[in-house]
Amino acid sequence: MTDILRKIEAYKREEIAAAKSRVSLDELRARIADQSSPRGFHAALAARRQKSEFGLIAEIKKASPSKGLIRPDFDPPALAKAYAAGGAACLSVLTDTPSFQGAPEFLTAARAACSLPALRKDFMFDTYQVFEARAWGADCILLIMASLTDDDAHRLEDAAGALGMDVLVEVHDAEEMERALRLSSPLIGINNRNLRTFEVDLAVSERLAPMVPADRLLVGESGIFTHADCRRLEKTGITTFLVGESLMRKDDVEAATRALLTGSASAVAAE
């Protein structure tokens, strides 16, 4: 685990302990009972692949540790609607506050504004967070293999499955990919960003994609700015992409989303 991830785990553990003291697991279960059923995150992406279309997980992200504030006029419901109108298949919503200025209410509001399934984008360490995610309306959670033991990953995956949620398993190198493939989730995300240096290189996806059997659905993450980037990764078998920052910086998010997916109008420019 990198120093960055260790620091994140430390504050997340504190957050989790505080949350448990405020809201019991029984209360979360009650809130989950009042939620509508999960929308089918993997199913939405698989449907795009079935039709030989690019599948986009469009990210709602206000800020990041490496870039600071990304979008000052931050309106999650409006962004969700723009993404949906532009052709996105799913949403990813940051709920981590210290590093990304995210919040649970951003997830709830974005999902309520459209019909797309939503991922809780956060650092998951405890099954309590899985219950939180479903109580807030999430249809999918993220597991970052660099921050988890195999036992933790299995435990979190099982908790999500029991709640009818999907799991996106994120990797950055071959060792993490081998571990991810021992999980049952069909969704494997390859993060092209090095969490030690924050450098981004699409060659990471090109190296790791051949390791993945055809029954898994690969997601390219980070460093995807243009339709040409999507076409480049398509050659490796990756036709699903998680994109946030480059779209978040655009005035017309709907048009930028459409351009990224189809190549029409002006492609999304690298920031």
Curated annotation (Swiss-Prot):
A Pfam family this chain is assigned to: IGPS
Pathway involvement of the protein, from the record: Amino-acid biosynthesis; L-tryptophan biosynthesis; L-tryptophan from chorismate: step 4/5
Domain of life: Bacteria
SUPFAM superfamilies linked to this entry: Ribulose-phoshate binding barrel
PROSITE patterns: IGPS (PS00614)
Record's keyword annotation contains Acetylation: no
Gene Ontology molecular-function annotations: indole-3-glycerol-phosphate synthase activity; phosphoribosylanthranilate isomerase activity
Key words of the record: Amino-acid biosynthesis, Aromatic amino acid biosynthesis, Decarboxylase, Lyase, Tryptophan biosynthesis
Record-level GO BP terms: L-tryptophan biosynthetic process
EC assignment: 4.1.1.48
Catalytic reaction equation(s): 1-(2-carboxyphenylamino)-1-deoxy-D-ribulose 5-phosphate + H(+) = (1S,2R)-1-C-(indol-3-yl)glycerol 3-phosphate + CO2 + H2O
NCBIfam families referenced in this protein's UniProt entry, alphabetically: PRK00278.1-2, PRK00278.1-6, PRK00278.2-4
Family recorded in the similarity comment: Belongs to the TrpC family.
Protein name: Indole-3-glycerol phosphate synthase
Lineage: Bacteria, Pseudomonadati, Pseudomonadota, Alphaproteobacteria, Hyphomicrobiales
Gene name of the record: trpC
